[in-house]
From Swiss-Prot:
Subunit composition and interactions: Component of the general transcription factor TFIIH, composed of a 7-subunit TFIIH core complex composed of XPB/SSL2, XPD/RAD3, SSL1, TFB1, TFB2, TFB4 and TFB5 which is active in NER; the 3-subunit CTD-kinase module TFIIK composed of CCL1, KIN28, and TFB3 which is active in transcription; as well as TFB6 that regulates SSL2 association with the complex.
Disruption phenotype: Prevents the dissociation of SSL2 from TFIIH after transcrition initiation.
Subcellular location(s) of the protein: Cytoplasm; Nucleus
Stated role: Component of the general transcription and DNA repair factor IIH (TFIIH) core complex, which is involved in general and transcription-coupled nucleotide excision repair (NER) of damaged DNA and, when complexed to TFIIK, in RNA transcription by RNA polymerase II. In NER, TFIIH acts by opening DNA around the lesion to allow the excision of the damaged oligonucleotide and its replacement by a new DNA fragment. In transcription, TFIIH has an essential role in transcription initiation.
The name this protein goes by in its record: General transcription and DNA repair factor IIH subunit TFB6
UniProt GO BP: nucleotide-excision repair; transcription initiation at RNA polymerase II promoter
Gene Ontology cellular component annotations, sorted alphabetically: cytoplasm; nucleus; transcription factor TFIIH holo complex
Protein's gene: TFB6
Matching PANTHER family: ADR380WP (PTHR37781:SF1), TFIIH COMPLEX SUBUNIT (PTHR37781)
């Protein structure tokens, strides 16, 4: 096979005449065949052969992809098409974008949401701020609980499996209990499950008059603990596996996981709203000294955590062979990010 000549190129200032172009002769076409021993014969009509090969490769890749994402019943219907591309098979399952969990249900099935609604502190006084001694005890207790959770998590990685977390569910329950404790110190509500309800069905601190909320504050920086929990949560989740679990167990675990994300999101929205609502209070007012909520540094730090979680969690679920839950994934920290980006 002779080496083809280098084609002539137009000069820098030369205008090409696109209507006067020479076609390739048979010798040039033969020179294009880099594998003369191949059974594929390149000719002037070789475009049909190339397109056919490309279509076969694309079809095979799509076929393998669909077998991974769909049920056996779907694959049977898919194979009966005799390699005829159907518009339905080229689309994602509609069910993957529908809610998989009942967001309004409590984190624990034994909890009754009707018993968790705030009682407006009996309609008398605002939540009492903790004294310095109480704040010190609070900090010591939360630090100890975070350390206990971290220690049990490390033990479950192989050091002492019996004393560690056997699965992700008990870890989520411990984190949820700690979130409830921290939230109680802020809102004086014993269980944060009521935040899963719609705005119309709950009465929480952020629904009060901003002028009323700015006059007092039981917040002394507890948000930093909630931010740490949110930061550690995705790191904990990625160390567990779902591959040997039943479908019902997977759904139950993911239900608790998403609800914990939604509760944290709602709390962060409330703490962010408190800062925003209190802007109405004059700076000379004594109430402005007791504004409750996340500061600018907390918000910037939390934005990075929220965006990182929204990226890493779908990747982790896909690595575990779990598909769907697109609706729940799209709602993770959605409320907080909307508020934070509006500043």
């Amino acid at each position: 096979m002779s080496e083809p000549n280098t084609p002539l190129h137009a000069q820098p200032n030369e205008q090409l005449d696109l209507n006067n172009l020479n076609d390739l002769d048979e010798k040039d076409i033969d020179d294009l065949n880099l594998d003369p021993n191949s059974d594929v014969e390149i000719s002037a009509d070789s475009g049909d052969v190339v397109n056919s090969n490309i279509d076969n490769v694309i079809w095979q890749r799509n076929c393998n992809k669909k077998r991974r994402y769909h049920t056996p019943e779907f694959n049977d219907v898919y194979n009966e098409t005799n390699n005829t591309i159907n518009d339905v098979t080229m689309l994602d399952d509609v069910d993957d974008f529908q809610p998989r969990i009942n967001v309004s249900s409590p984190f624990s099935s034994a909890t009754k949401l009707s018993e968790l609604l705030p009682n407006d502190h009996n309609g008398t006084s605002h939540p009492r701020r903790l004294s310095m001694s109480q704040q010190s005890k609070f900090i010591s207790y939360v630090d100890d609980q975070l350390l206990q959770i971290q220690r049990k998590f490390v033990q479950s990685r192989g050091l002492n499996i019996k004393n560690g977390y056997a699965s992700l569910t008990p870890l989520l329950q411990d984190l949820k209990t700690l979130v409830d404790f921290v939230w109680y110190s802020i809102a004086h509500v014993p269980n944060s499950d009521y935040l899963l309800q719609s705005e119309e069905k709950r009465h929480c601190p952020d629904s009060r008059n901003p002028k009323d909320t700015c006059g007092y504050s039981s917040y002394f920086g507890q948000g930093s603990y909630l931010i740490k929990i949110a930061d550690d949560l995705i790191d904990y989740v990625e160390k567990f596996t779902f591959k040997n679990m039943e479908d019902s167990e997977i759904n139950d675990t993911l239900s608790k996981l998403f609800k914990l994300f939604f509760i944290l999101d709602r709390i962060f929205v409330i703490l962010t709203d408190d800062n925003d609502n209190c802007k109405e209070v004059p700076k000379t007012s004594s109430a402005s000294k007791n504004i409750a909520g996340l500061n600018g540094t907390d918000i910037v730090r939390l934005k990075g955590i929220a965006e990182r979680t929204r990226v890493r969690l779908p990747i982790f679920l896909e690595s575990q062979g779990i598909h769907g839950y697109h609706y729940e994934l799209s709602k993770i920290y959605e409320g907080f990010l909307d508020h934070a980006n509006s500043f």
